[in-house]
């Protein structure tokens, strides 16, 4: 009887980690591992919010600080373009982990260029160097994981 591989083994098998000095490598590996664990239990096809709640649980179990739906202010020449608008109109990060890595969650048929641009824009606006785009609507989650570094 073969043992079930842990999420750490799955990461090593399914995700090619670039050798060398990766920014927040250990943290992003933990986040990806948590996403794989969530996907194993929930599978594809649910609403994004379901995955967000499960991810918060998994990341907190790992001792990580997780903030969700973090408002992002859009500044233009010193003016806050979001100032005076209702809170629901704010740009929001799906997740910010350890105040270092932005995690944008999706549950879409196909990740499009606009999803990558959204993450890169959030990284620029918040001055965060690393972001993960994770699409849970994949049979193999690793096919829906994208790591961005600025």
Segment roles from a protein language model:
Residues 27, 97-98, 127:
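Residue-level preference for short coil/turn positions at secondary-structure junctions
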Residues 1-23, 77-87, 93:
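Intrinsic disorder/low-complexity segments
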Residues 103:
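Conserved beta3 VAIK motif of the Hanks protein kinase fold
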């Amino acid at each position: 009887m073969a043992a079930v591989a842990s999420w750490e083994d799955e990461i090593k098998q399914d995700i090619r980690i670039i050798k060398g000095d990766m920014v927040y490598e250990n943290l992003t590996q933990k986040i990806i591992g948590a996403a794989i664990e969530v996907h194993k239990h929930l599978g594809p096809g649910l609403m994004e919010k379901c995955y967000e709640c499960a991810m918060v649980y998994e990341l907190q179990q790992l001792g990580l600080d997780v903030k969700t739906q973090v408002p992002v202010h859009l500044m233009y020449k010193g003016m806050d373009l979001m100032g005076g608008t209702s809170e629901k109109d704010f740009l929001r990060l799906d997740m910010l982990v350890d105040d270092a890595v932005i995690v944008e969650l999706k549950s879409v048929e196909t990740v499009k260029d606009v999803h990558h641009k959204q993450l890169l824009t959030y990284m620029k606006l918040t001055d965060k160097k690393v972001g993960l785009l994770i699409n849970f609507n994949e049979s193999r989650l690793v096919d829906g994981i994208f790591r961005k570094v600025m």
